[in-house]
Structures are given as structure tokens and as C-alpha cells.
Amino acid sequence: MAIGFICSSPDAELFSEKSRMSSSVLLGCLLCCMDWSAAVPGKTEPFRKLFDAIMIKKLKSCSAAYPSDLDEGSMCDMADASPTSLELGLSKLDKES
């Protein structure tokens, strides 16, 4: 499922750096981001689009922040991927609806 999401994402260049990136690191980053979905159950399609955009952004910053760790397959530190960004996005969605 995670690989399917990445391959089908509008940002397919995530895989263009495949030689640099360990799939376990990428999967680890994705799973950290996906934990957010449990915080806000039952949201609609606009929420999923926002959520996907946040995930892609976090994956890119994760791969950029830890280039030396990627070959070793270590887990990215996603502590800064707090629900704050998600909450800001959700409040924007609430205002639009």
C-alpha cells in the first residue's frame, strides 16, 4: 500500500532518487506521517488531498534532511511532523465549508 501511494503520487520524482534512498527509510517516514490519519477520522476528499500534500512534503524534507543516513536505512526523525500543520490545514478546510 505504501509503495502504491508513492508511485501514484503526483510527485513521482520521489522515486527518481531511488539510488540514494533506502526503501525502509522512505516507508518509515510514510508510516510516521500516516499516524496523523488516526487523529482525524471521517474526513472527506478535500481532507485527503491536503493530507497527501502534507505527507509528500514531509517525505521530501525527510529525504533532504538525512541524506547520509539513507544508505544505512535508519529511521527518519519525524518529531517535527506534529499535528500542528494538519490542524492548520483542517481549520482552513472548515472555514471554506
UniProtKB/Swiss-Prot annotation:
The source organism is Human herpesvirus 6A (strain Uganda-1102) (HHV-6 variant A)
> What would you give as a GO molecular function for this chain, any one?
cytokine activity
The disulfides recorded in the entry are 32-62, 33-76
Q: What does the sequence similarity comment in the record state about its family?
A: Belongs to the intercrine beta (chemokine CC) family. Highly divergent.
Cellular component GO terms held in the UniProt record: extracellular space
UniProt superkingdom: Viruses
Q: Write down a Pfam family by its short name.
A: U83
Q: Which UniProt keywords apply?
A: Cytokine, Disulfide bond, Signal
Record protein name field: Putative CC-type chemokine U83
